[in-house]
Amino acid sequence: MKVTLPEFERAGVMVVGDVMLDRYWYGPSSRISPEAPVPVVKVNTIEERPGGAANVAMNIASLGANARLVGLTGIDDAARALSKSLADVNVKCDFVSVPTHPTITKLRVLSRNQQLIRLDFEEGFEGVDPQPLHERINQALSSIGALVLSDYAKGALASVQQMIQLARKAGVPVLIDPKGTDFERYRGATLLTPNLSEFEAVVGKCKTEEEIVERGMKLIADYELSALLVTRSEQGMSLLQPGKAPLHMPTQAQEVYDVTGAGDTVIGVLAATLAAGNSLEEACFFANAAAGVVVGKLGTSTVSPIELENAVRGRADTGFGVMTEEELKLAVAAARKRGEKVVMTNGVFDILHAGHVSYLANARKQGDRLIVAVNSDASTKRLKGDSRPVNPLEQRMIVLGALEAVDWVVSFEEDTPQRLIAGILPDLLVKGGDYKPEEIAGSKEVWANGGEVLVLNFEDGCSTTNIIKKIQQDKKG
């Protein structure tokens, strides 16, 4: 099955925050200055790139979404260069010009792939009247699906709490890339996206994943957040939401060259995906895939729709994610060459709950790779009745593919996955519940191939049917 990207072209996102211009001067250096013990660089290349909140807006526009950028600049060459660069990539800029301040500019001098010095041209915008920013937000709220507040502690978000309240009143989700340790100022936001260092600076050092979850959930409660996404570098990212099981997503980066701007890519893809009408879980899946692409590039970068599609499709050469049967067979063959034990299970997985997560984690522990085969919508309807599935196949597969325990997800149209299992022939076939091994679809084929069949227990008290009944009862009540 091919994963469909969000309809980015219908997504409108406004980014408000600290905009800046990144300037790079490159050139050879072969001598020391006679004036001081410093290298002399003969500049032969000059590059200018939007930075800070402007880079977030570029990431949104690169997906084909409608990106609007609001921030504070001076009236100078840097502001004009910034506006031109952003217009070239279809970002609509609506800057507030402050004649008493320069546009924030960071100039880096590089030679032989080494940064020799960075020169910052800036004065904090604290104290500047925020009303023009509020007016621009108010004017846009009826036509956007998400508001991103990009905080680099330069003063543009001095009135961040008022901005959050404006968006909440209009029912627009607010996503914030936080700065500093005062998370009180972000109270009421829909989603905060701190990296692990920023998170631990607020809650303290976390030695285990369980501590991250426990302290993250407390932070959500303390600051009335709807969700928290902790980006954890090579350990992937963790999505925490009240009343839901934590969603830990392993990194999808194949190689890491440069993490510069990866956080901007993550929040940009999150916002564009939510604004396109997708769920937060789906948004995190796409953002995680995009981060895996962008860290494989040098310098601040963006991700194109084609790059994102290639990443989330989990093609055989990337070794993860949602796959077609043919792609899965290639991936399994490659895994076997590496001597890996392949485990396979199946199910509907309609409303993912803690019992599912626990079961899949247990199944994954039985080997090196876990395949999850998922009933198609038609198959689910025949199995569960006309009211099911609640979530369509594509959404179910995307969420499963985001789980740390799951390597590959594939769908099947039949009532049982027997044909699919016979084609894959896993080393271990796993099923949850009170089945007898010989009753499990595909067991005969696996045994005939020398494989094993194992029945695992489901966690007590967890049931999709019970969840649906409770929702229906709550609606009636």
Swiss-Prot record:
Modified residues (N6-acetyllysine): 179
Region span, Ribokinase: 1-318
Pathway linked to the protein: Nucleotide-sugar biosynthesis; ADP-L-glycero-beta-D-manno-heptose biosynthesis; ADP-L-glycero-beta-D-manno-heptose from D-glycero-beta-D-manno-heptose 7-phosphate: step 1/4; Nucleotide-sugar biosynthesis; ADP-L-glycero-beta-D-manno-heptose biosynthesis; ADP-L-glycero-beta-D-manno-heptose from D-glycero-beta-D-manno-heptose 7-phosphate: step 3/4
Residues holding ATP: 195-198
Region entry Cytidylyltransferase, spans: 344-477
PROSITE patterns found in the cross-reference section: PFKB_KINASES_1
Annotated S-S bridges: none
The keyword Transferase appears for this protein: yes
GO terms for cellular component: cytosol
GO biological process: ADP-L-glycero-beta-D-manno-heptose biosynthetic process
Entry superkingdom: Bacteria
Active site location: 264
A GO MF term: heptose-1-phosphate adenylyltransferase activity
Keyword Transferase: yes
Quaternary structure note: Homodimer.
Listed NCBIfam families: cyt_tran_rel, PRK11316.1, rfaE_dom_I, rfaE_dom_II
Family: In the N-terminal section; belongs to the carbohydrate kinase PfkB family. In the C-terminal section; belongs to the cytidylyltransferase family.
Protein name, entry field: Bifunctional protein HldE
Encoding gene, per UniProt annotation: hldE
